[in-house]
Structures are given as C-alpha cells and as structure tokens.
Regions:
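Membrane-interfacial loop-to-helix junctions in multi-pass transporters
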Residues: 53-62, 114-115, 177
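Alpha-helical transmembrane segments
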Residues: 1-9, 82-283
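Membrane-interfacial loop-to-helix junctions in multi-pass inner-membrane proteins
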Residues: 16-27, 52-53, 57, 81
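Transmembrane alpha-helix boundary signature
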Residues: 13-19, 36-50, 99-104, 159-166
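Membrane-embedded alpha-helical core segments of multi-pass
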Residues: 2-10, 27-42, 61-71, 87-93, ...
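Hydrophobic mid-bilayer segments of alpha-helices in multi-pass membrane transport proteins
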Residues: 25-30, 259-261
Length: 283
C-alpha cells in the first residue's frame, strides 16, 4: 500500500509539473523499495530447481523488476486505451494461472496474486470505455505507473514466493511458468521498452527521452488507425500470455502450433493496413 501511495503521489506531481527523468526514477525506486520492505520480494527463482536469494540480492532484484514493469507500461501508454487494454488482457492470463495455483495447490501467495490480478482487470475494464479512442479521460503517468507497479507486485508474489518444485509433477515447462508468465504478459511493453532504450542510447539521447518511434507509432505510420493499432498490440499480448498459460494444461505441441498460427494471423493483419488494401484495389 505504501508503495502504491508513493507512486500515485509521484504520478500526480509528474502530471502536474512534468518531473525530469532522474527525479521520477528516484521516486520509482522509493516506491519499489517500500514494497520490498513490506515483504513483497523475490525469495527464490525457478532456476535449476529452486535458487534461494540472499536478502540483499532479493531486494535489489525486486526493485529492478518493479522499475522495469513500471516503465514498460508507462512507455506503452501512447494511444488511447492501449495501456489499459494490454494490462487488462495480461492480468487476465495471470489471474487464470494464479487462480489455478490457489485453488488446485492451495498456495496462499497465489491467492493474493489472484486478488491483485482481479483488481487490475476491474480497474482497466472500468476505465477503458472512457479511455478508448477518442478518450474523455486519460490515464496519465499516475495511472500507468500504478498499474505497472501492481503488475510487478502480483508477478513477484507468484514468481518469487511460490516454490516451483510443487507445480509441475515432473514436467519441465510448467515449473518455469512462474518466471515465464510475467515476461510473456509484459512481452509487448518490454519489447517496446528495450527497442526504445537501444534506439535512444545509440543516438546519444537519454533512454527516457520521448520520441515517435514506439511500436504503436510504427503501426500508425503503416496506415492503421488508433483503434486498430491498439487491437493489434492487445491481440499479440493475449496470444503470448494465454499461450504461456496453456502450457500448464495442454500438450506443448498444441500450444506451439496454436501460437504460431496466431502469430501468422496477427502479423498478416498488422502488415495489411486499410490504406494498403484500398491502394491494391485501385491499382
């Protein structure tokens, strides 16, 4: 709760006064540190069985995960309804898996992660009709950083505090789901963040300096409208996130085949914007 209060206060100040990147980073570290001090930390990682973290590494890694999640969601919030749609779908996949763990395996931490995921779904679903193109209400840094923090919190509660040894029944992939699933849920924002950092640092600019070369900007340049661009990026998020979840319930070859077909379908949709189809008909 303290971490959420800090991030909300930071977001309000940023939305009102436009804080510089170092100041925002310090505030985000304080929020992540407060969350870690309250016990929401990575205790172990599902690497070669169970790799237990020492207290210092646990806190530092937790802060890093929270910072990445906050800024990934914050950077992807560039179109009406985009951040809310991606987080809602990603939280839906996380809810499905954490609910399964809390009911089938009785993990208390999974139950808390389920609650946070359900809250995120409700927050985004209630906000989205007002934030859809043409938006009447905007999320701002306050909202995007808050839902990024909550995504990180639910992921940490499942990834680093649920022992993977009891999940898989001897099969390998489901044991890695607690660490794979958070990455898959934030795959689109994380990819956008990574490309932005590489792009800006290569140009000698700050990684936090704004530009018009994000994934959603590229979709707009291809000829998609804002609504279609949001739907395409949300579809990719849902495909990757629910594809990861499905590995716990169906044979991996079925998941792989379905995901591959989905990627082809969504990529074809993304590379065939309306203006290109109109041009093809007129030529």
């Amino acid at each position: 709760i303290i971490g959420c209060l800090i991030i909300v206060a930071l977001g309000i100040l940023d939305d009102k006064f436009g804080l510089d990147a170092p100041t925002k980073l310090v505030g985000q570290i304080l929020a992540a540190g407060a969350m870690a001090m309250q016990g929401v930390t990575l205790v172990w990682l599902p690497i070669r069985g169970t790799f237990i973290l020492d207290p210092t590494t646990s806190v530092l890694l937790t802060v890093l995960v929270v910072l990445v999640s906050i800024n990934a969601v914050n950077m992807v919030d560039g179109l009406d309804g985009l951040a809310a749609s991606i987080v809602m779908v990603g939280a839906g996949a996380f809810f499905a898996y954490s609910y399964f763990l809390s009911v089938a395996n009785g993990y208390q931490r999974a139950a808390l992660a389920t609650l946070i995921s359900a809250s995120l779904i409700g927050m985004c679903a209630g906000f989205l009709p007002h934030n859809w193109f043409r938006a009447r209400v905007f999320m701002g840094d306050t909202g995007s950083m808050l839902i990024g923090l909550l995504m990180a919190a639910s992921s940490i509660m499942l990834t680093g505090q649920v022992d993977p040894a009891g999940l898989s029944g001897g099969t390998l992939l489901p044991a890695f789901l607690p660490i794979v699933l958070p990455l898959s849920i934030l795959a689109v924002p994380l990819l956008d963040l990574l490309l932005a950092v590489i792009r800006r640092t290569r140009k000698g600019r700050s990684p936090f300096a704004p530009d018009k070369e994000h994934l959603h900007h590229r979709l707009l340049k291809l000829g998609h409208g804002q609504e279609r661009a949001v739907l395409i990026m949300t579809a990719f998020t849902g495909l990757i996130a629910f594809g990861a979840v499905s590995t716990a319930f169906v044979p991996i070859w079925i998941t792989g085949l379905g995901t591959a077909l989905g990627v082809v379908a969504i990529a074809s949709w993304a590379l065939n914007p309306p203006k290109l189809r109109v041009h093809a008909r007129n030529s």
